[in-house]
């Protein structure tokens, strides 16, 4: 279905913010930075295969890059994609690893 190589390129990093932390605590939702070309189906397959959890749904959005200036020069940061992955009841992703 989805190759090992594509899994590693689809998921970039977990997105940590105040809103993402609140969503994780209340709605069993994990937020990831993903490749701009990634589809919802690819994101779902990558999370299920990599973390061995069941995904209920995936919501995505493209965050527009900010305009930044340094002196007289103006530039723009790249656009990036964010995915809200809602896990099924009883499922959890442990990023820190289980300490024994």
UniProtKB/Swiss-Prot annotation:
Gene3D superfamilies given in the database record: 3.30.70.330
Stated role: One of the early assembly proteins it binds 23S rRNA. One of the proteins that surrounds the polypeptide exit tunnel on the outside of the ribosome. Forms the main docking site for trigger factor binding to the ribosome.
Keyword terms of this UniProt record: Ribonucleoprotein, Ribosomal protein, RNA-binding, rRNA-binding
Organism classification: Bacteria, Pseudomonadati, Pseudomonadota, Gammaproteobacteria, Vibrionales
GO cellular component, one term: ribosome
Gene Ontology MF terms in the entry: rRNA binding; structural constituent of ribosome
Protein name according to UniProt: Large ribosomal subunit protein uL23
Biological processes per GO annotation: translation
HAMAP family in alphabetical order: Ribosomal_uL23_B (MF_01369_B)
Subunit structure: Part of the 50S ribosomal subunit. Contacts protein L29, and trigger factor when it is bound to the ribosome.
Database matches in Pfam families: Ribosomal_L23
Similarity section: Belongs to the universal ribosomal protein uL23 family.
